[in-house]
Amino acid sequence: MEYDEYGVEYKNTIILLHGGGLAPWNFREEALQLKDKYHVIIPALDGHSRSDRDFTTIESNANEIISFIDEKCSGQVLMIGGLSLGGQILVEILSRRSDICKYAIIESALVFPMRTTYALIRPAFSLCYPLIRKHWFAKLQFTSLRIRKDYFDEYYRDSSAITRENMISFLRANSAYKLKNDIEKCTAKTLILVGGRESAIMRKSAETLHMKIPDSSLEILPGYHHGDLSINHSCLYVMKAMSLISN
């Protein structure tokens, strides 16, 4: 597994899982703020730029990260955070290993299957995938995602490096993911975040996670879009993480 690493001299480890179609730069600003106190690891998710594996399933990627934590971190870390696809992988990790982290931040994780979206992904991306490497199209897509302008070059580089099959695979997995009952065994103190301007199914997902995870709190962020917090407001993300850990 390929990953970026910060603060290697510190014992307490935080793992941050980026969103689908993005890369470790999603959480770079957070890592730079945390590295003077914590060991921060940002893996490249399967099927993404810099990854050494194709994407197969959310469950497989979750198992890979669990194995990494077992091998490199003695089976437990201080905190895991995840956005969108990374948030779904985090939910799956918590469902499979209830005590793998003491704290968790789940941001904008969809946990209800969207069957129509799932059915449309392959035909839609088979047609439009060649456009992804076009600079003008990438710019339009980037603008629609509301990502900070200074990330465009990295976004363009990394999204262009994703193969068509990998992109279809992780988008279909994202739209098909269903919450497992074992999430109720999670022992991590968990903060669940969703943007106030996200879709109704995203808010429903956040509310369901809050209901299912015993020691959890839910924050709906007024005026925020999908992924807005971790991508565009790193200082606030770190403040929320520190508050979660210290309280």
Name the predicted role of every residue range.
Residues 224-236:
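Catalytic histidine-centered segment of alpha/beta-hydrolase-like enzymes
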Residues 95, 101-131:
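Flexible "cap/lid" loop of the alpha/beta hydrolase fold
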